[in-house]
């Protein structure tokens, strides 16, 4: 489902295109919304939504929004730092680090975000609503909340060995 393009060293993925309708006195006015994910494959990732009367315009607006809304994710090599739970609306996501060679085991919208971020080994599951926009939002919340042991140790004023036990 995700369409992939390379541009400026960024991986651009089209996650979803939906037709929406505005009902007016004279009938319905149709337009399109696009959801895209952009990442450098090295810990920077962003998502955006665009809306226009035609699909290509909606996609270009969404890609522009995604480039503006990029975040940096602390990765542990090619996987996550620790297991993460997050939710947005009725969508709940669970992501956990996986050993080398596992691959990205995740569903549609989550897979696009994780691959764009540069995660190569992860186990992920989506619960509740599988609405693409909510799943992408929940995945971003989880990735944003993830912290490295070094940051936790610095915040607590302890060594990394004390934190990890």
Curated annotation (Swiss-Prot):
GO terms for biological process: translation. It comes from the Bacteria. PROSITE patterns: RIBOSOMAL_S5, S5_DSRBD. Residues 10-73 form the S5 DRBM domain. Keywords: Ribonucleoprotein, Ribosomal protein, RNA-binding, rRNA-binding. The keyword Ribonucleoprotein applies. InterPro entries: Ribosomal_Su5_D2-typ_SF (IPR020568), Ribosomal_uS5 (IPR000851), Ribosomal_uS5_bac-type (IPR005712), Ribosomal_uS5_C (IPR005324), Ribosomal_uS5_N (IPR013810), Ribosomal_uS5_N_CS (IPR018192), Ribsml_uS5_D2-typ_fold_subgr (IPR014721). GO terms for cellular component: small ribosomal subunit. GO terms for molecular function: rRNA binding; structural constituent of ribosome. It holds the Pfam family Ribosomal_S5_C. Part of the 30S ribosomal subunit. Contacts proteins S4 and S8. With S4 and S12 plays an important role in translational accuracy. The N-terminal domain interacts with the head of the 30S subunit; the C-terminal domain interacts with the body and contacts protein S4. The interaction surface between S4 and S5 is involved in control of translational fidelity. Belongs to the universal ribosomal protein uS5 family. PANTHER family: MITOCHONDRIAL RIBOSOMAL PROTEIN S5 (PTHR48277:SF1). This is Small ribosomal subunit protein uS5. The lineage of its organism: Bacteria, Pseudomonadati, Pseudomonadota, Gammaproteobacteria, Moraxellales. The gene is rpsE.
């Amino acid at each position: 489902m995700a369409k992939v393009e390379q541009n400026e060293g960024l991986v651009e993925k089209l996650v979803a295109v939906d037709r929406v309708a505005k009902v007016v006195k004279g009938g319905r006015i149709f337009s399109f919304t696009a959801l895209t994910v952009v990442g450098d494959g090295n810990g920077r990732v962003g998502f955006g939504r665009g809306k226009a009367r035609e699909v290509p315009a909606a996609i270009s607006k969404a890609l522009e929004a995604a480039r503006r809304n990029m975040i940096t994710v602390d990765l542990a090599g090619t996987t996550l730092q620790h297991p993460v739970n997050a939710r947005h609306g009725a969508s709940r996501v669970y992501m956990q680090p996986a050993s080398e060679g596992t691959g990205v085991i995740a569903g549609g919208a989550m897979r696009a975000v994780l691959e764009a971020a540069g995660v190569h080994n992860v186990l992920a599951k989506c619960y509740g609503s599988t609405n693409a926009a909510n799943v992408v939002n929940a995945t971003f919340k989880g990735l944003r909340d993830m912290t490295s042991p070094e940051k936790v140790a610095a915040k607590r004023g302890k060594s990394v060995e004390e934190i990890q036990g």
